[in-house]
Structure formats: structure tokens, C-alpha cells
């Protein structure tokens, strides 16, 4: 299972920008073919770190699908005309296959289901939410990704999926409250918390080089460091801290 390793995988194929936009529903997007000063083309992915970690992880998998042009592959192999709506469905399915592989998921689902099933092999809505939250923890993906995967692999009906996602007779706020309780009761502290991360890979090093070169004003560099929470003094102080380790010749 990839879990949050997908964030590092994404880093290999593009420059990832993390920044919190609290009033923005967009979880992320990508921009391709941006030239640098030498004309080399680069791809950038923005991830909204005001979203929860599990949403950031699924967003990373989604954007990886765009970078790998999975939609174009499907279009060519299946001889389809792929519009925007279908394109997003293809990429979402790719992200689900990447983050929640079928064989592993089905075994995990079986184990979790058997823990809470009734003697007649049925399950209550409350216990189904327990199964979903435990699977969220195993795969580190959002609730909706698990629910949709359950439906895709014929574990639950469309009606049950709609019910859990707040499109049935039970209000979504009641479902969300119960899910939150299960998360807290199990100590799944990573969930439902935004990271508010401000970071661009290798950006701190580039700012240091720009600072030393004198090509960018000190004020502008300071402003950028503040924007991305890069504190030069703290970084330098940490690098200069002696480590509590023994040398190779210690007896």
C-alpha cells in the first residue's frame, strides 16, 4: 500500500507546491510545460494543504494520473472520445486503483467486516461506518474513496453508498459526526486534520542560492520565506546543533 508515500512518488515527476487556501474547495491542480530560464519544461502540482491529509494524499494520486496521462491511454486503447467529465472519472478510478488495490482491499474488507457482522452475516449502518473508518486508516484515503471502492467492487449497493455519502434519508452531518467519533475512539489522529503545510521541494536551497548571488533583494527573499514559513535562522541553527551520537572510534 502506498499510503502517504504517494506524496514522495509525486515529487519524482514534478515540482509540488503545498499551500493552504482555506476558502477554496479545489483540492489541487497541475500545470504542465512551464519553461525555466534555460527553456526546459517543467510540471507543477499544487496541493491545497488546508484540506485534510487523507484528501491531500488522494489528490496527489489523482494528479499523478494526469501527469502519466492515464486518460489518454484509456482514450487510445478503448477508442473513446474522452470529454472533461469522463476524463476526471478515469483519473479518479486510476487514483483508487493506485491507492486501494483490489486484492489487498478485498482481503482487508473481509477481515474488518467479519469483526462486526451479526450472526446472520448482515451489518448495521453504524458498524459499516466502523469498517469504513478502519479501511480509511489502513489505506490513508478519504471516506468517499473507500465508499466508492466498496461500491465498485460490489461490497455495497448504490443505495448504501448514497446513504453513507449523505444522499439518502440520513443527514450527512449525522454520518459525519459518527465517523468523527469512530476516528477519535480509535486514536486515528492523522485524520480530518489539515496540515496547512507551506512548502516547495528544494525551494529553501534555491532561496539560499538567490540570497548569496544578490540577484534578488533581501526584502523579497524575506517575504517569500515568511510566506512559505522558511526561517533561515532556525534552519541554520538546527544544522549546527551537535548530535548525541558516538563516533566510529568510541569504545
Q: Each predicted region: which residue ranges?
A:
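Active-site hotspot residues in diverse enzymes, especially metal/ion-binding acidic/histidine motifs
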Residues: 1-251
Amino acid at each position: 500500500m502506498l499510503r502517504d508515500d504517494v506524496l514522495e512518488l509525486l515529487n519524482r515527476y514534478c515540482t509540488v507546491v503545498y499551500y493552504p487556501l482555506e476558502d477554496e474547495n479545489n483540492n489541487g491542480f497541475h500545470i504542465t510545460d512551464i519553461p525555466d530560464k534555460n527553456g526546459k519544461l517543467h510540471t507543477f502540482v499544487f496541493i491545497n494543504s488546508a484540506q485534510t491529509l487523507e484528501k491531500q494524499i488522494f489528490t496527489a494520486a489523482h494528479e499523478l494520473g494526469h501527469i502519466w496521462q492515464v486518460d489518454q491511454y484509456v482514450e487510445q486503447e478503448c477508442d473513446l472520445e474522452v470529454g472533461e467529465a469522463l476524463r476526471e472519472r478515469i483519473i479518479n478510478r486510476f487514483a483508487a486503483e493506485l491507492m486501494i488495490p483490489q486484492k489487498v482491499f478485498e482481503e482487508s474488507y473481509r477481515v474488518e467486516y467479519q469483526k462486526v457482522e451479526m450472526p446472520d452475516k448482515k451489518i448495521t449502518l453504524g458498524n459499516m461506518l466502523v469498517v469504513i473508518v478502519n479501511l480509511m486508516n489502513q489505506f490513508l484515503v478519504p471516506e468517499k474513496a473507500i465508499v466508492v471502492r466498496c461500491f465498485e467492487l460490489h461490497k455495497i449497493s448504490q443505495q448504501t453508498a448514497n446513504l453513507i455519502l449523505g444522499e439518502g434519508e440520513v443527514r450527512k452531518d449525522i454520518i459525519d459526526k459518527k465517523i468523527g467519533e469512530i476516528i477519535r475512539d480509535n486514536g486515528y489522529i492523522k485524520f480530518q486534520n489539515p496540515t496547512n503545510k507551506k512548502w516547495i521541494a528544494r525551494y529553501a536551497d534555491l532561496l539560499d542560492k538567490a540570497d548569496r548571488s544578490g540577484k534578488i533583494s533581501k526584502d523579497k527573499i524575506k517575504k517569500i520565506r515568511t510566506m512559505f514559513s522558511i526561517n533561515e535562522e532556525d534552519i541554520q541553527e538546527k544544522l549546527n546543533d551537535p548530535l548525541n551520537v558516538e563516533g566510529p572510534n568510541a569504545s
